[in-house]
Amino acid sequence: MAKKLVAVVKLQLPAGKATPAPPVGPALGQYGINIMAFVKEYNEKSASQAGSIVPVEISIYSDRSFVARLLTPPAADLLRKAAGVQKGSSNPKRNPVGTITRAQLRQIAQQKLPDMNANDIEAAERIIAGTARSMGIKIVD
């Protein structure tokens, strides 16, 4: 008989630095899974992406087992790194905070494509460009 899926928990954690403290402990503890096993697995899988936020989707089953699937870092995080800024603009239309090139935009779109709701790279680029615009990051050719 197949295992019954109880819940899917999504968290955004620093790569390689997850601890059983909040937000991980309370989010997973209520389902009775081994928190330390998850923390070890997450830190091993995400160690190569140190310094960025890596979302994880945890499928929890009725026998208290789980499957953790790492996703790509948030688009806003990738855009901030590419533009070299700490945070987005408080007023994106009036005062832009940085710029990125079309090549950087395409690279971010290619990285995000597996986790995006887009069929091709052009659609993914438009989605990422919209995120950049709302953050006050200009795209130059």
Swiss-Prot record:
Transmembrane segments: none
GO cellular component: cytosolic large ribosomal subunit
GO molecular function: large ribosomal subunit rRNA binding; structural constituent of ribosome
Origin: domain of life: Bacteria
GO annotation, biological process: translation
Post-translational modification: One or more lysine residues are methylated.
A Pfam family assignment: Ribosomal_L11_N
SMART domains: RL11
Keywords for this protein: Methylation, Ribonucleoprotein, Ribosomal protein, RNA-binding, rRNA-binding
InterPro entries to which the protein is assigned, alphabetical: Ribosomal_uL11, Ribosomal_uL11_bac-typ, Ribosomal_uL11_C, Ribosomal_uL11_C_sf, Ribosomal_uL11_CS, Ribosomal_uL11_N, Ribosomal_uL11_N_sf
PANTHER family to which the protein is assigned, alphabetical: 60S RIBOSOMAL PROTEIN L12, LARGE RIBOSOMAL SUBUNIT PROTEIN UL11M
Record text on subunit structure and interactions: Part of the ribosomal stalk of the 50S ribosomal subunit. Interacts with L10 and the large rRNA to form the base of the stalk. L10 forms an elongated spine to which L12 dimers bind in a sequential fashion forming a multimeric L10(L12)X complex.
Homology family: Belongs to the universal ribosomal protein uL11 family.
Biological role: Forms part of the ribosomal stalk which helps the ribosome interact with GTP-bound translation factors.
Identification of the protein by name: Large ribosomal subunit protein uL11
Gene: rplK
